[in-house]
Amino acid sequence: MSSALSETSLDLPPGFRALALRELGDAFAKAVEIAGEQGAGTLVWTRRFDLVEVAVVLEPEEPLVTARRAFFAGMSAAADALAAHCPPEKPMVFAWPDTILLDGGLVGGGRLGWPDGADEKKPPDWLVFGLMLRLMMPTAPAARDRTSLEAEGFEMLEPRELIASFARHLMVHFETWRERGFQPVG
């Protein structure tokens, strides 16, 4: 592995450890690969200028059937991170279940992974929530069904800022879930 776990490249909240991949890396696949050995709080991200790609390893304490709700906590954290950097009055919506739209255009989405063969009635060894957001496109899309953060007015947004913001919001959502139940999160 050419990159090492290093928290110095991102301003992450306590409990997170960062692993940066080169441009062509797949953050989600890498997080799934190392989830069992690295554990909860491992945040894998890809160093790209055109795309935010991040995946976080989670270790739920409830059965897989309900632990999958972590997906909604991840999507809510993504929305909160985007809202913190979003131009005023920019419409942002989710298209069920995993797509994020800005002003009607596809800008990104999330996904959730768990170990093959995990028992629905037992806590899985790990979950991985992955998020991908388009920062910029080389050319303007012909159709209005796709967009980027740059095209929607997120000027000069560094991927590292958005990833760190996502991690902070994710931590808040999981803490809320732990203290007050899932209802305030989902």
Model-derived features with residue positions:
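Long, positively charged amphipathic alpha-helical accessory segments at protein N-termini or as interdomain linkers
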Residues: 2-48, 60-89, 106-186
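Active-site-flanking beta-strand signature of metal-NTP-handling nucleotidyl enzymes
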Residues: 52-57
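Catalytic palm active-site di-aspartate
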Residues: 92-104
